[in-house]
Structure formats: C-alpha cells, structure tokens
Amino acid sequence: VRHALRQRYADVQFECIRHGYLCEDRRLQELRPDGHTQIYAVDISFCPETTRHLQRAFGSDFVWIDHHISALEAWRDTGWEHPAGIRDTAHSAAWLTWHHLFDAPAPLAVTWADKYDLWQQDAEWETRTCPWQLVVTCRFSTPERYDLRVFSDERLLETYLRRYGQPMFAYEQHLRRREAGAVQPVVLSLDGHSYRLLFLNSSLRDSQTLAAWHRRHPEINVDGYLVGQHVPPLRWKLSLYTANGSGINAARIAQRFGGGGHASAAGFTLSLSDFEKHIKTFQK
C-alpha cells in the first residue's frame, strides 16, 4: 500500500491511527480540509459516524479502501451515500489499493500478500505466500525496509524469499511446534449458542499452530480456532478463525463483543470477567 501510494503521490504522509473496537482516534475529529489534502483510509474500519464525518468534510478527497465485512455491512445498513474508493471482501486491502490506483495487474509481491490476508492456502502457501508475509511484516531479524524494486523485479523478489523469508518461515514453524503443547479445547458461549474452539495463548497470534494441531487430531470436532493475548492487567485481545468446513461466521461473533473483521477471521477484546464468563475448557 505504501509503495503504491508513494508512486502516485510523492509527498504522501502516513499516520498510525487508533481505531476500531478499542477506540477512535481523537485526531480524526480534528481533521479539516485545506483544498489540496486527500485522505486515504486503507484497510481500516472506522465506525460509520467517523466515516460519515470525513466524507462530509473532505468529499471526494476522502477515499476509503477496505475489505472487512463487518465494516462494510455496518455502512450499508446506514443507507448513506458510499464514499470514494473501493471496497470488496474478495480481496485484501493491498490488492484493492493497487487496483484503485493503477490500471495494471497486481505484481507477485501484492498477489502473495492478497492470498495471505484471505488465507488462501494453495501450493505456494509455505514456499511463497507465508515467507513473503514474514518479510513484509518485518518479523524476527528482517530488514526494516526491503528494496521496493521487488514490485517490478521478480528475480529480486525471489532473492528476498531465499535469503530472509524461507529461513524465517522454517524458524517460525519450529516455534509453532513448541507452542502446540499449550493448545486447549474450549467452548465459547454466546446468546444461547455454543462454539467449540481450539484456544492458544500465543505471541504468534494466528491460527496456523491450531490448524496444524487439529490436522493431527481429526477426531476432535471444532468450529474454529481462538488465539489470545493477555494484555495486563484487565483484558484479552482475541483473534477468531473458522475451521475448514465450519459454518460459523467469525465477524458475526466478533461484532457481538464489539469487534469485527471477516467471515473467516475476526478480532475482539474481552475483559477478564467476560473471558471467564463466555469461554470454558472442555475435555478432548
């Protein structure tokens, strides 16, 4: 996304904005149009009132690019006019941004990011998609900035995969195997419904450890995977993922707790008391 915007706008600035189910950044209410500034809200799910405020203030200079089903449905339910931009749950924000800005196919670097964000586990998942994601997100000892020529030079992209991405992926797999012993089957109870999940309190914060564990224990029937991070002193940050073949909608469940996301993956927070109220262990 940054690379695409830098190609289009030489003087683009990037701001880290707190948003979503935790809080809305106060700076959003203080932004004022100046006749030449455009705002791109990319991969970000403001509450509808905040989006409406920015749309009214900036008009077509406010561009919203997003793919979170919870945010898109919340906006649709208002009946308000759609802001400028592009929104589609079938692609990642990186792919949508490229498509919005350029009349050209997305490069491999963007395509792999797209597949990772949508959890499309094809034949390239472990050799290309996941290793490239580790480079992009600067995990472990990755260089802080990779050479942006990877978007046009596929040989350079392959060099980054071999030198950084694939070794880091192997190391991460080792960490996941070490964490597998901490997997707990739990039941999440909500509005009279019970969902059987595999739970892990994990610093890696995604479902791959749980999915791999589940493949080794197919006799355990679960609806999805719950990855948690205890944030002292008073809350849990949680990511919910659907298991293959499951009929649950992660975004719907997350919305009931004030969160949101995608049908297959979503996030929310719980206080310690709500965590103990809604989530219980069950026997394997």
State where each predicted segment sits.
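Hydrophobic, aromatic-enriched interface-forming segments
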Residues: 114-187
